Regions:
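Active-site regions of metal-assisted phosphoester/phosphodiester hydrolases
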Residues: 1-131
């Protein structure tokens, strides 16, 4: 990916929409691209970052999955969210996005304290793509 080795987004300088546009442009030049990580944008909150990504034409692999768990990667108050009114609410802010719809067999939270030990304030996400 062009830009490898340099910061594409500087959160302290650019709001989410600008960061997303830079990242999507860099990744979207490929025929098939996956973007994953902590997007700090709740999947069930309308009109914010999650909806911006959807409107950009990217696919949430969690929604594409034939089998999935509840998807919550944050299940308690964490740094950066402690002062929010819903700080203790479960959140799905760690996501895997794909530049086009692909057949996703399953999506599940890993290292979230259920099947594997919790290792961070965020759990990971694992998808299995069908061939």
């Amino acid at each position: 990916m062009e830009g490898r080795g340099r910061a594409l987004c500087r959160p302290e300088e650019e709001p989410f929409a600008d960061q997303w546009n830079i990242l999507a442009a860099a990744a979207g030049a490929k025929p098939l691209a996956f973007l994953l990580g902590d997007f700090n944008s709740e999947a069930d909150v309308r009109g914010e970052g999650y909806d911006l990504i959807l409107r950009s034409g990217w696919q949430d692999t969690y929604r594409l999955a034939r089998q999935r768990d509840d998807g919550y990667t944050v299940v308690q108050a964490i740094d950066g969210w402690r002062d929010a009114p819903d700080a203790a609410a479960k959140k799905r802010i760690d996501q895997i996005w794909c530049s086009q719809a692909v057949p996703v067999h399953s999506s599940r939270v890993v290292f979230g304290g259920k099947q594997e030990p919790r290792v961070s304030d965020h759990a990971g996400v694992l998808i299995e793509v069908e061939r």
